[in-house]
């Protein structure tokens, strides 16, 4: 059973409080955080120290959680200027524990504002955003976890997932839009895959996961649950996708983010040319997955929060000749 088709755990705040006390020896206040496929609780200790209690989806593979723990440790050791959550050990010295069929971790809480909170981010901030993602991927370039180069649903190369889940989209015209971008991917990306470097990437550097400090500068990143070993260019493609979904003319924003990334981790010409194709495919994953999961979990409104914007974006770009779209 996949984590996207299995319901999340249903721990109550009082149970989260008890877990914190039993496993970590903490007396805390508890607040529920929004989450898509697992459960997250904000914890605040009596001394003011803040944490996030992460309770995995019951279908989650523990090896994937170990991957996340290892990656956070690696980044912190490789480049201390990149703020990422640290994983807290239990009173028994464990980084991951199991409770009622779910794997549990406690992470430090990263304070800050989200890029999403900035109504019209200026070019310098978008360049800084791109440069931050570049730094993150430079650190990942030295990271390897060979047993888990998985075929993840959110890996843009997983076109078979899009094809097999089109049935969950009711509108034939909407299906046709997704098919258009699948065909576009197969025509423009597949023949050039040998030129596109692969490595581990965060794979979800959207404007809800990248943090700003009080001075308005990029400070850190959270939520490593979608990590994948895939195209390096996908890191930028994911970030760009969520930045421009609501933009009628996104070229300026795109160029700023790409310029920042290029200043730290230069992409090849073929990778630059692939970006707009990967952006459109990522938006397809957003709408297809949303339609699939909201049929399974209609009560979870978090699932489809970006879907309307993604459809507008895709229908707009379906009329464009992507190879003529100058992204940088």
Predicted features and spans:
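Conserved NTP-binding catalytic cores of kinases and kinase-like/nucleotidyltransferase enzymes
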Residues: 1-89, 213-214, 326-327
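ATP-binding pocket architecture of kinase catalytic cores
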Residues: 46-143
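Active-site activation/catalytic loop segments of kinase-like enzymes and analogous catalytic loops
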Residues: 233-266, 282-298
């Amino acid at each position: 059973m996949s984590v996207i088709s299995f319901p999340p755990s249903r721990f109550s705040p009082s149970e989260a409080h008890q877990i914190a006390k039993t496993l970590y020896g903490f007396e805390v206040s508890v607040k529920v955080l929004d989450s898509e496929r697992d459960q997250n609780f904000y914890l605040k200790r009596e001394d003011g120290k803040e944490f996030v209690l992460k309770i995995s989806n019951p279908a989650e593979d523990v090896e994937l959680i170990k991957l996340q723990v290892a990656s956070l440790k690696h980044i912190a050791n490789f480049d201390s200027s990149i703020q990422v959550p640290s994983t807290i050990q239990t009173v028994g010295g464990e980084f991951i524990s199991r409770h009622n069929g779910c794997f549990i971790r406690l992470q430090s809480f990263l304070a800050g504002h989200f890029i999403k909170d900035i109504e019209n981010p200026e070019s310098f901030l978008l360049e800084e955003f791109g440069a931050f993602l570049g730094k993150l991927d430079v650190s990942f370039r030295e990271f390897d976890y060979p047993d888990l180069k998985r075929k993840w649903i959110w890996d843009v190369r997983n076109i078979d997932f899009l094809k097999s889940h089109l049935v969950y989209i009711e509108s034939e015209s909407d299906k046709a839009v997704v098919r258009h971008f699948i065909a576009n991917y197969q025509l423009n990306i597949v023949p050039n895959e040998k030129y596109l470097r692969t490595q581990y990437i965060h794979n979800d550097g959207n404007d809800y996961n990248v943090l700003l400090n009080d001075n308005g500068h990029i400070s850190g990143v959270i939520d490593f649950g979608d990590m994948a070993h895939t195209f390096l260019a996908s890191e930028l493609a994911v970030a760009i996708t969520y930045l421009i979904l609501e933009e009628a003319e996104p070229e300026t924003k795109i160029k700023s983010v790409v310029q920042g990334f290029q200043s730290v981790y230069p992409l090849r010409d073929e990778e630059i040319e692939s970006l707009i194709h990967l952006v459109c495919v990522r938006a397809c994953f957003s709408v297809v997955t949303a339609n699939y999961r909201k049929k399974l979990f209609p009560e979870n409104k978090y699932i489809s929060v970006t879907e309307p914007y993604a459809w507008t974006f895709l229908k707009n770009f379906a009329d464009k000749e992507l190879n003529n779209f100058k992204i940088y």
